[in-house]
Swiss-Prot record:
The keyword Ribosomal protein does not apply. This is Ketol-acid reductoisomerase (NADP(+)). PROSITE patterns: KARI_C, KARI_N. One of its GO terms (biological process) is L-valine biosynthetic process.
Length: 329
C-alpha cells in the first residue's frame, strides 16, 4: 500500500529564514502564498509589470516585485504560471538569478518532464502539487483542513530536497490531508492523461453526446441538460466520498442495473485502445510537441475549438437554467 505522509512527518522549521517567492498570483499562486504566509513563512510575490494581480496581492498583505527581483531575493522559487509561459519567463527572469543552494519548485511537471526547462545542477528541483483548485486549497487551509498533494524530487543538490519539499507541502496545508510521493514523469503523464481521457476531454464529449442524443430524439433540451450535465456532480460527489461501490449503494436498483448492462456498451475495448493511444502520445512527447507548437502560433486551433464549443446548444440551455437556480445566485 502506498504511504501517505502527514503533519508529524514534515518539519516546517526547515523553511525558517528562507524567503519564498511565489511566481504568479492566480488560482494556485494566491493559495500557496497566503497559506505559507499564515504558516509563518516569509513570502513575496513575483509578477510581470502591469499585472492585474498586483493590487490583489498587495491588498492581501504581500510584497510584490518583478519576477527577476523576486527570484534574486528568494531562497525558494515556486513557479505557478501557466505551462506555456514558464519556459520564456524562466530563461529571461528566473535562470539568471539562480545561485547554489536555491530551491526551484513547480506544481506540475510539464516543463521539466518534456525538457523545456533545464535547471542547473547546483539547485534543488522539487514539486508540490495540490490535488485541487487554488480556492479549495485556500478554503480548506482556513478551515483547519487541507487538500491532498503530491510531492517529488527531480534534483537533490542540497541532499535535503525531499525534506524541504515535504516542509513546503506542510506549509500549504497538504500534510493535514496527506501527501503522496511521486516523480515528475509519473505526475505529468498521469495528470495529462486524466485531463484528456477522463476529466475534461472524455467527460465533456460524453456529456455533449448524451445531451445531443436526447434532444435529437425529441426530448426537451432542459431535461436533457439535467440528466446529462447537472446530475454529474451528484454522482461524482458520491464517487469521491466512497468510490464506485458507495455510489452504487446510493443509487436506485434500476440505475445500478443500467450501470452494469449499459456502461460497457459505451466504454469498451475500443475505447480503451484509444485511451492507450492518448497515453502513448503523452509518453512519447507528441502531445507536448503539438501543444508547444500551438502556443507558439498564438493558439489558432485552440481558439477556434473554444469558440465552436461555446456555441453548443448545451451551453445556451445551461445558461438559461442556471439563471433560474436560486441556490447558484
Amino acid at each position: 500500500m502506498t504511504q501517505l505522509f502527514y503533519d508529524t512527518d514534515a518539519d516546517l522549521s526547515l523553511l525558517n529564514n528562507k524567503t519564498i517567492a511565489i511566481i504568479g498570483y492566480g488560482s494556485q499562486g494566491h493559495a500557496h502564498a497566503l497559506n505559507l504566509k499564515d504558516s509563518g513563512m516569509d513570502v513575496i510575490v513575483g509578477l510581470y509589470k502591469g499585472s492585474k494581480s498586483e493590487s490583489k496581492a498587495i491588498s492581501d498583505g504581500l510584497q510584490v516585485f518583478s519576477v527577476s527581483e523576486a527570484c534574486e531575493k528568494a531562497d525558494w522559487i515556486m513557479i505557478l504560471l501557466p505551462d506555456e509561459f514558464q519556459k520564456d519567463v524562466y530563461l529571461k527572469e528566473i535562470e539568471p538569478n539562480l545561485k547554489e543552494g536555491k530551491i526551484l519548485s513547480f506544481a506540475h511537471g510539464f516543463n521539466i518532464r518534456f525538457g523545456l526547462i533545464k535547471p542547473p545542477s547546483f539547485v534543488d528541483v522539487v514539486m508540490i502539487a495540490p490535488k485541487g483548485p487554488g480556492h479549495t486549497v485556500r478554503w480548506e487551509y482556513q478551515n483547519g483542513q487541507g487538500v491532498p498533494a503530491l510531492f517529488a524530487v527531480e534534483q537533490d543538490s542540497s541532499g535535503n530536497a525531499r525534506s524541504l519539499a515535504m516542509a513546503y507541502a506542510k506549509g500549504i496545508g497538504g500534510t493535514r490531508a496527506g501527501i503522496l510521493e511521486t516523480n515528475f514523469k509519473e505526475e505529468t503523464e498521469t495528470d495529462l492523461f486524466g485531463e484528456q481521457a477522463v476529466l475534461c476531454g472524455g467527460l465533456s464529449e460524453l456529456v455533449k453526446s448524451g445531451f445531443e442524443t436526447l434532444v435529437e430524439a425529441g426530448y426537451q433540451p432542459e431535461l436533457a441538460y439535467f440528466e446529462c450535465l447537472h446530475e454529474v456532480k451528484l454522482i461524482v460527489d458520491l464517487m469521491v466520498k466512497g468510490g464506485l461501490s458507495q455510489m452504487r449503494d446510493s443509487i436506485s436498483n434500476t440505475a445500478e442495473y443500467g450501470d452494469y448492462v449499459s456502461g460497457k456498451r459505451l466504454i469498451n475495448s475500443d475505447t480503451k485502445k484509444e485511451m492507450q493511444k492518448i497515453l502513448k502520445d503523452i509518453q512519447d512527447g507528441t502531445f507536448a510537441k503539438n501543444f508547444v507548437e500551438e502556443c507558439d502560433k498564438n493558439k489558432p486551433l485552440m481558439t477556434k475549438l473554444r469558440e465552436e464549443n461555446s456555441k453548443h446548444e448545451i451551453e445556451k440551455v445551461g445558461k438559461g437554467l442556471r439563471s433560474m437556480f436560486s441556490w447558484l445566485k
